[in-house]
Curated annotation (Swiss-Prot):
UniProt remark on cofactor binding: Binds a dinuclear copper A center per subunit.
Reactions performed catalytically: 4 Fe(II)-[cytochrome c] + O2 + 8 H(+)(in) = 4 Fe(III)-[cytochrome c] + 2 H2O + 4 H(+)(out)
Membrane topology (Mitochondrial matrix): 46-59
Binding-site residues, Mg(2+): E198
Organism: Neotamias bulleri
Keywords: Copper, Electron transport, Magnesium, Membrane, Metal-binding, Mitochondrion, Mitochondrion inner membrane, Respiratory chain, Translocase, Transmembrane, Transmembrane helix, Transport
Predominant location: mitochondrion
Keyword DNA repair set for record: no
A single GO BP: ATP synthesis coupled electron transport
Entry protein name: Cytochrome c oxidase subunit 2
Mitochondrial intermembrane face of the membrane: 1-14, 88-227
Length: 227
């Protein structure tokens, strides 16, 4: 989860988020090199008295500043497209969970189980126990097995919402009348927090998401107790 004064991303907990962090570092390096080059050229222009007022044509320079940006864009686009295809790929999910957004709470349905569904509301600040997080705790957590591919089907009952878990690299819009899907795989157990990431009304800030990733055996025990 995020901490006060945090400068970087949250710790990656899924293969997709690991790829996104690598892509961020790759792109940031390219941006840093371009910015350094531009600042260097500007500093030279400000400190030298030499000018080329008689230059009418420079084919070599025009060729360089046409080809070089094209190469840079390709270096950014190729890894980006690779990650996009990885995020859309869903191979034989072990579990499917249907998520519906409401004003202002989430409801979940485990489609592989009969009558396993519940609503998830934010716990008011006045009801929090010591150590619990303000505006992030819910009365019913989404319990999922770790290290298994899980498909999330996401939609909305009323207005636009967005289901987002930053540490898993997930953000999928919940659109009325449309069923979007995303896949997640957690590499380690724990609690993972998210929030609605689409302004949806006066209580938009009060729609937290809490995933509890546990070993498969613990998940089976939990699902049996819920039925």
């Amino acid at each position: 989860m995020a901490y006060p004064f945090e400068l970087g991303f949250q710790d990656a907990t899924s293969p997709i988020m690991e790829e996104l962090l690598h892509f961020h570092d790759h792109t940031l390096m390219i941006v840093f090199l371009i910015s350094s080059l531009v600042l260097y050229i500007i500093s030279l222009m400000l400190t030298t008295k030499l000018t080329h007022t008689s230059t009418m044509d420079a084919q070599e320079v025009e060729t360089i500043w046409t080809i070089l940006p094209a190469i840079i864009l390709i270096l950014i686009a190729l890894p980006s497209l690779r990650i996009l295809y990885m995020m859309d790929e869903i191979n034989d999910p072990s579990l499917t969970v249907k998520t519906m957004g409401h004003q202002w709470y989430w409801s979940y349905e485990y489609t592989d189980y009969e009558d396993l569904n519940f609503d998830s509301y934010m716990i008011p600040t006045s009801d929090l126990s010591p150590g619990e997080l303000r505006l992030l705790e819910v009365d019913n957590r989404v319990v999922l097995p770790m290290e298994l591919p899980i498909r999330m089907l996401i939609s909305s009952e009323d207005v636009l919402h967005s289901w987002a878990i930053p540490s898993l690299g997930l953000k999928t819009d919940a659109i009325p009348g449309r069923l979007n899907q995303a896949t997640l795989t957690s590499t380690r157990p724990g609690l993972y927090y998210g929030q609605c990431s689409e302004i949806c009304g006066s209580n938009h800030s009060f729609m937290p998401i809490v995933l509890e990733l546990v070993p498969l055996k613990h998940f089976e025990n939990w699902s049996s107790s819920m039925l």
